[in-house]
A protein has these predicted regions:
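ATP-dependent small-molecule kinase phosphotransfer cores
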Residues: 35-92, 105-106, 117-120, 130, ...
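Post-Walker A helix-loop "phosphate-sensing" segment adjacent to the P-loop in P-loop NTPases
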Residues: 26-33
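Small-molecule kinase domains that catalyze NTP-dependent phosphoryl transfer to phosphate-bearing small molecules
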Residues: 120-171, 196
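Short, charged/polar connector segments at secondary-structure boundaries
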Residues: 177, 181-326
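Conserved glycine(s) of the Walker
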Residues: 16
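Hydrophobic positions on the alpha1 helix immediately C-terminal to the Walker A/P-loop
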Residues: 20
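P-loop (Walker A) phosphate-binding loop of NTP-binding proteins
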Residues: 12
Length: 327
């Protein structure tokens, strides 16, 4: 008999890890351990903010050393549990490794609204957003230097879940379905990670006119009738900041028209990995994703995809008067 594995959570600040992991632990009858709570307690004892403790930990290995050993001991115990930790995926070999993401502005809004200690208060949305980015980068750099692992690399995980618009209940149901083998088990088994993405945050790489010429009139209704779980996973690339379609524009369009907040996908390439013909994900995005393509896709689906930084787009990508260009 196979012993059920643990579930370990990492993710963006403000992505809802605590809310989701607490409920999943209750639903599955598992003990939950939060390393974030431990770090916050350590910061309060030192009268530091979480960011200050992160920066201090870059110089003082004792901070991470204590927490690392705790995680190693828990992983070695073989106990089936839910672990909320930014590095548990590195220590737990036999676990469902979940990484939760959200749009940075939405993450800042959530953090700004939740109760916090006096050391963690922010005066504005922009300050919260900037501090969250700074704190995340501090952690990322520390992990790269100390452990030689990059927490931003999606292939470290089994399941990526975007919580920008999806509610906690929907996210919880999807994660439990994946854990129990009821959601895209082939992707999880053979080619993780499984991506559960917000369709309104995925960039097209084809012109909407071309898509309309090939659109199957029944596809929108077929997707609505089937539900999002049976939807064939899209094939997706990732620049390190933006997700984009490699294959599956019609399914993505149908999901948007049906109001889905999550769609399943498999990762084709991320950052420097090749998409097609040796072209990296970053270069493919720059070659295929034009301001006019973004503008027309957004207008057709009633969404607001932001223009990426000009450096991520091809030559002359943002021109005065071009659709989607800033005024």
């Amino acid at each position: 008999v196979t012993v059920p594995q643990s579930i370990v959570f990492n993710g963006d600040l403000g992505s809802g890890k605590s809310t989701v992991s607490v409920e999943i632990a209750k639903r599955l009858g598992m003990r939950r351990v939060s390393v974030g709570d431990l770090y916050r307690q350590m910061a309060q004892e030192r009268q530091m903010t979480a960011l200050q403790l992160n920066l201090h930990a870059e110089l003082d290995q004792a901070v991470d050393g204590y927490v690392d050993q705790l995680q190693r001991d828990i992983a070695a115990s073989g106990e089936r549990l839910v672990m909320d930790s930014r590095l548990a995926w590195h220590f737990f070999t036999d676990a469902l490794k979940v990484h939760m993401i959200t749009e940075p502005g939405e993450a800042a809004r959530r953090v700004l609204l939740r109760p916090s200690g006096p050391a963690e208060q922010y005066t504005s949305l922009e300050e919260a957003k900037a501090r969250l980015v700074e704190r995340s980068e501090s952690e990322r750099n520390r992990f790269i230097i100390r452990y030689g692992v990059d927490k931003a690399q999606l292939r470290n995980y089994d399941l990526i879940c975007d919580t920008t618009r999806a509610g906690a209940a929907e996210v919880i149901e999807h994660i439990i379905a994946a854990y129990e083998g009821r959601l895209c088990s082939e992707v999880l088994r053979e080619a993780p990670p499984l991506l559960l993405l917000d369709p309104a945050r995925v960039y097209p790489t084809e012109d909407i006119v071309t898509l309309r010429d090939r659109q199957d009139a029944g596809s929108v209704g077929d997707v609505a009738a089937a539900g999002d779980e049976p939807l064939e996973p899209l094939r997706i690339g990732y620049t390190g900041e933006h997700f984009f379609v490699v294959d599956g524009h019609r399914r993505l369009s149908a999901a948007l028209q049906n109001g889905y907040r999550l769609v399943p996908a498999r990762l084709v390439a991320e950052v420097d990995e090749p998409v097609v013909g040796g072209m990296s994900a970053i270069d493919y995005f720059a070659a295929q994703v034009r301001p006019s393509v973004i503008h027309d896709w957004s207008a057709a689906h009633g969404i607001d995809l932001p223009l990426p930084k000009p450096a991520l787009l091809g030559d002359g990508a943002v021109l005065a008067g071009e659709p989607g260009a800033s005024a």
